Amino acid sequence: MKRLILFALVSTLVQMVWAQKDVDTYIAVNEVEDPNTYAVIISNENYKHEAKVPFALNDGAIFKRYLMKTLGVPEQNIKYVADASLNDMNYNLSWLERVVKVKQKEARAIVYYSGHGMPDEDSKKAYLLPVDGYSTEPTSGLSTEALYKRLGAMPASQTLVFLDACFSGSKREGDMMKAARGVAIKAKSAPVSGNMVVFSAAQGNETAYPLQSKEHGLFTYFLLEKLQKSAGAVTLGELSDYVTKQVAETSIVVNEKSQTPTVTAPVGTTDWRNWKMANKAAKKFETMSKIVPTVQAEAPAAANTAQPAQTPKTRQRSFLKRNNTANQENPE
């Protein structure tokens, strides 16, 4: 009996200590580098035609910090895009495809998205909405079906997808987006293939809520918390079990609404549960400063004597301009 009481006291003390450790600033630092993991992080908060997604920029910025510090992924292996257009999303996913094509089975790919999701009312397909997209026109976004098809075709040893978005037509605050007409729509789950596992923040007809007190999406917060507590040495099975339990319980208590994270893997496979986020646990923790997420400002216009900076968008526009000129000169 005394042992049980002692165990309960120790467990309570441990929980109290961890409760004081901010996931944003108290980070496990791994001295072992992981040069074969490549990631694309997309954080869409400030929409042009839709409501903001609270804390989405913070979600992505801190997830990047955990990839670098706790999992040991070099910064050059990570593409982080704040408030991404559809062109930005496709451009960075294409980068990931090119890298994995070169690295083949040596590579592990990670894709993280925080922002609006949207269902097509007719087809019930789910879409990720870029900041220049319209909820009334889901095809202005990127369908999860197309995304999974692209990622599943990559020859990576593992492909992990984390989506802090919902596809019912509701916003992170819980009310409905313009196109949803006040009714939650249950979007179809797109099939996955290859060595891919998809973690989603909520079931098809649920809302992915924020955790206001922590300034994160509810799903992302507990994803980060498990990476923090495990110092990175956690299997996907352990991560899934923890995040699902914590999100479901917290959402009922805080939001009085259900939010149930889901995991989708190729049919008939369970070995993904043994995959590890980091091969070795980080051996030390560091207290870091808070990140103030910002959107990178556009570069000022170059002087007439200089060539303008070539961004993915300007490169694409230049290519299209050259193509159009060639077509005009050489009509079929």
Task: Name each region found by the language model.
Residues L4-L13:
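Sec-dependent N-terminal signal peptides
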Residues F7, W18-E332:
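Cysteine endopeptidase catalytic domains of the caspase/legumain-like
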